[in-house]
């Protein structure tokens, strides 16, 4: 399995790894065992913990009603150029909205929750609105699966409400 996927990545002229998780058996399979243990920038996948933290801290009370006003800066991704709720922002992967959410959460609270979640290397260096995009935060694919599985099971150390709303959006 792993060798076949590695060949496919190579054939596409790219480097990557696929990590799958069989929920019922707690079985993790990886196309590249070395890369599956190497931390990478979480980039867009950080929208999940960022959403949980926003809900838990009250930065967002209602994912369908709290509105983040567009800052008026025209960006190349057209769907970003408008007001968003948390639900609409995650649907179009609106980085500027999530950067604003992170600024409102603040470094102290963000660090607290990354520590509570045991999320990757927990390093928010590089700026409160950049650490998951270009900064110091790293998480490997196996850690990502563990985090998402804890959210799936509702066992993260935050309220059930924040977890349920995040799963819903």
Predicted feature residues:
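Short, well-structured active-site flanking segments
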Residues: 55-72, 158-163
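Structured C-terminal helix/loop/strand segments within mature extracytoplasmic catalytic/sensor domains
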Residues: 1-7, 39, 103-108, 152-169
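Mid-domain, small-residue-enriched loop/turn segments at the edges of structured enzyme/sensor domains
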Residues: 78, 82-86, 98-153
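Beta-lactamase-like hydrolase cores
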Residues: 1-38
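Active-site SXXK
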Residues: 39-64, 89, 144
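Short linear capping/connector segments at secondary-structure termini
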Residues: 33, 67-73, 125-133
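Short helix- or helix-capping micro-motifs
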Residues: 85-93
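Glycine-rich, acidic and aromatic/proline-enriched surface loops and short helix-turn segments
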Residues: 11-25, 60, 107, 113-120, ...
